[in-house]
């Protein structure tokens, strides 16, 4: 038997009903923010791929009007840069963190972007979905959300595992491109408290991180969810279901008598924007990859969506008081009418940053927080990230985090779990002046593979030996020497097989000491560091971390040379070099 209820988004008093055997519906007082009554009318969709986006240069930037916390930070980069006091000290101290890139998309066991790819006929995630759940005209992503319960999820145990691995900050996905909020969202009924596990996941992660003095960041990836879902409005082109629409076309009225009665699919899938193309036949869903433009016939809806985008971020900020927040995308800032910001041009991103900093000042008496805009390069008042790639130079003009996933951004089979990839990534990033966050795979049930658990323990053992040279360190005057760099991309066996040699060395510094990181152990035990030749200044002592006592060394015009005997750890090794004002030898 299936239980249902009827709930108007404005006046409902009961939670959506769920399949038989699950928890009974719970009474609640829904937020007015859930309603679509203020959304502008949307024109009927034109033929797929029939329109080119308009030139952004012909459109003025829209100044948004939603309220933000009062304070000195105004929503302009000039004001934000003027008042921002600088990168918090804790950011540099933390150095190594985890990216909890997890949510219902793990249900597909198909890696990243499963929610969209399940609607792409013929692709592996779509085939997996049909085999495991059914056809997306009958069982679409909304139904995946309902089925996702994460019964093994234990935020306390997982957070402890990350902390034991040496991770000192935690980045957690609040909402991905799938448009599903993983908190008790005021502005979106498609959230983890209403649909699926019925838990405030961001609330739990935040609580456990703060118990362990881990800095907490919520990440938001929904800027382009309003056009990312265009595939959900399609239909199969072949086979027995050819022409049968997927579930993106459903409306609130279609839910009567179903488990999702009272939930409007438009608040999940948004609207059909498949009419826009990039001029080469690519659909709107490909615009983020090298394209730009304004969706000229949907500007009213775009403004409405951009406001909700911002209000959702501010809702989570106000509820969970994070140390950082992060917006995803590959454009210079959200809603910039280019790349992932295509479609609309407004100042919503700056308003959210100003709100965050003003709120921090009012609540804590100082701005000890950091906003991250993924590709906002060169702006000292916000951080940025490097996704699956390592910069080729030291970057100190703004705070930044290097980020990469083990295998892929969401759970999948046959990932390579080897702590050497975490160690090498950490060293490559911190030697260039950044922090490092690794996305550790969590399965649909909320647990980790045994091999992943073992990897984290191995990482923790390595950090016990070398952590003092990691936390609070900064880039030296030179990031390294040698010719080999770890390949870009998600972490796999490819990175494990990186052919480092004893000539590949990285550098950091802390408290007047230079740390030389050996990316490979010398087969004959002899190490020569050319950057620490006599022209670098006088070296007074050298110590191998994890090995008691100083090492005998020789400093010549050719380099600093010493012989090592016993490995105190695995993966990479650190020499602590003392001297006065050491600078790289030319």
Language-model features, listed with the residues they occupy:
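Bacterial N-terminal signal peptides
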Residues: 7-19
């Amino acid at each position: 038997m299936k239980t249902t209820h009827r709930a108007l988004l404005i006046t409902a008093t009961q939670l959506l009903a769920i399949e038989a055997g699950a928890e009974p519906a719970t009474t609640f007082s829904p937020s007015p923010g859930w309603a679509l009554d203020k959304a502008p009318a949307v024109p009927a969709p034109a033929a797929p791929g029939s329109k080119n986006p308009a030139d952004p240069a012909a459109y003025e930037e829209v100044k948004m009007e939603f309220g933000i916390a009062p304070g000195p930070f105004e929503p302009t980069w000039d004001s934000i840069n003027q008042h921002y006091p600088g990168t918090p000290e804790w950011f540099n101290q933390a150095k190594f963190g985890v990216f909890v890139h997890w949510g219902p998309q793990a249900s597909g066991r198909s890696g990243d972007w499963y929610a969209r790819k399940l609607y792409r006929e013929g692709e592996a995630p779509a085939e997996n979905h049909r085999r495991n759940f059914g056809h997306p005209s009958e069982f679409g992503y909304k139904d995946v959300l309902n089925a996702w319960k994460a019964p093994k999820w234990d935020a306390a145990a997982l957070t402890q595992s990350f902390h034991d691995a040496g991770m000192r900050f935690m980045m957690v996905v609040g909402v991905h491109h799938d448009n599903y909020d993983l908190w008790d969202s005021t502005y979106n009924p498609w959230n983890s408290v209403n649909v699926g596990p019925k838990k405030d996941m961001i609330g739990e992660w935040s609580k456990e991180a703060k118990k362990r003095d881990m800095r907490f960041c919520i990440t938001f990836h929904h800027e382009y969810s309003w056009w990312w879902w265009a595939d959900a409005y399609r239909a199969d082109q072949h086979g027995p279901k050819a022409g049968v629409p997927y579930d993106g076309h459903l409306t609130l009225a279609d839910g009567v008598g179903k488990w999702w009665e009272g939930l409007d699919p438009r608040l999940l899938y948004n609207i059909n924007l498949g009419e826009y193309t990039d001029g080469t036949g690519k659909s709107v869903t490909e615009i983020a990859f090298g394209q730009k433009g304004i969706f000229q016939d949907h500007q009213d809806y775009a403004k409405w969506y951009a406001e909700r985008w911002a209000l959702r971020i501010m809702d989570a900020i106000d509820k969970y008081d994070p140390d950082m927040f992060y917006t995803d995308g590959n454009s210079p800032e959200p809603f910039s009418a280019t790349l992932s910001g295509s479609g609309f041009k407004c100042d919503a991103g700056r308003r959210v940053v100003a709100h965050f900093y003003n709120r921090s000042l009012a609540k804590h008496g100082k701005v000890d927080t950091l906003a991250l805009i993924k590709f906002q390069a060169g702006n000292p008042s916000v951080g940025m990230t490097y996704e699956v790639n390592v910069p080729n130079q030291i970057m100190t003009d703004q705070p930044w985090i290097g980020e990469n996933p083990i295998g892929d951004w969401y759970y999948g089979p046959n990932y390579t779990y080897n702590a050497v990839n975490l160690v090498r990534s950490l060293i490559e990033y911190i030697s260039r002046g950044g922090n490092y966050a690794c996305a550790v795979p969590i399965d649909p049930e909320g647990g980790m593979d045994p091999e992943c658990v073992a990897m984290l323990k191995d990482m923790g053992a390595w950090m016990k030996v070398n952590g003092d040279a990691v936390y609070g360190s900064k880039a030296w005057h030179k990031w390294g020497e040698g010719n080999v760099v770890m390949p870009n991309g998600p972490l796999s066996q490819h990175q494990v097989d990186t052919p480092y040699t004893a000539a590949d060395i990285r550098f950091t510094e802390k408290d007047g000491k230079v740390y030389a990181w050996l990316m490979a152990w010398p087969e004959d035990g002899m190490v020569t560091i050319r950057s620490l030749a006599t022209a670098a200044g006088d070296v007074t002592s050298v110590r191998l971390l994890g090995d008691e006592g100083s090492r005998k060394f020789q400093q010549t015009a050719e380099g600093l040379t010493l012989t090592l005997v016993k490995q105190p750890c695995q993966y990479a090794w650190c020499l602590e070099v003392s001297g006065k004002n050491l600078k790289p030898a030319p």
